[in-house]
Amino acid sequence: SVDALQEAVERAVAMAREAPEDAYAGLAPAELLMHETPRDLDIDDGGEISAEKLKDMALAAEDAARAVAGVTNSEGGSASSGRAVMALATSTGFARGYHGTSYGVSASVIAGEGTGMQRDYAYHSSRFATDLETPESIGLRAGTRAVRRLGPIKLDTQSLPVVFDPRVGGGMLSALIGAITGSSIARKTSFLLDAMGTQVFAPGIRIIDQPHRLRGLRSKPFDGEGLPTAERAIIDDGVLTGWLMDAASARQLGLTPTGHAARGVSGPPGAGTSNLHMAAGSATRADMIGSIKRGLYVTEMIGMGVNGLTGDYSRGASGFLIENGELTVPVAEVTIASNLKDMFRALVPADDLVFRYATNVPTLRIDGMTIAGA
């Protein structure tokens, strides 16, 4: 109601009066705002899926997962359908909006019995309902993954090549982005504080943010402050090209905001990416794994053991042992550790990039990581 909106505005103003002064807070410069009509990014299919149909899809995914031999229980299946509208208006004259649909199906199941139980999952999301994988294929993948994890071994502490499955390798990019936001640089809490313009990854590595990718899960014509978005190579030929900044962090650093402001419905903007990916390499996944005499193929990461200040990296992991170029027995309860600077320089991407998530990478190999086991 109008009265409720008025009350919300009055409360916001009252809280703002009590907040400590921030010399860098404020709206984005008017001359940098997007003034043209937002381009069509093909992120709304104009449809919706009924609640009854969503129920059927969730059950189909769960049933397919439970039908896999060895699956003993289910944590459930889910299906979703939604439409979101993003509208932003500022007192500097910006007033634009865009809308998009999203669909998703997932399943999570348990294989085995007693202390030997293992859990795994599968999901798929898309902007268009017609692009969504079938619930049956998603459920089958979840069940197969869970059963493959049965009977894991532990490893002794050693140094091994580690290969990251694409569904977990995106965490490498998340660690990078967290270290190059304007706020991290302004607070001097980044292990890449002095890395702008330097070789952070091996030559040939490219990491690209594509806010205008058609049907992208995070595509957007303007950022959280009204600045136009644009494609950018964050890492180009292994070199860090610059920071990701909203208006406040740009003011603090004496630089220009980059169109990477991200925000929710409350709180100030921060900085983030849209559709982020690492470009594919030249080696096939089979060749990458085939050249490893003994290593670890990681399919799940556990915990958040990344020190943003030093770059020290230590996370729980599970996956499969690589022996003589083949995936063999499942592995669980190990910790993989190194430093992100060393990991970035040693990272080699395979040629199997597929755009499935908001952040996408091919299979990744990093040699010389410490595996801490039993």
Segments from the language model and where they lie:
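Dual-mode signal for accessory low-complexity, basic/Gly-rich regions
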Residues: 195-374
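Active-site bordering "gate/hinge" segments
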Residues: 1-220, 224-227, 236-239, 326, ...
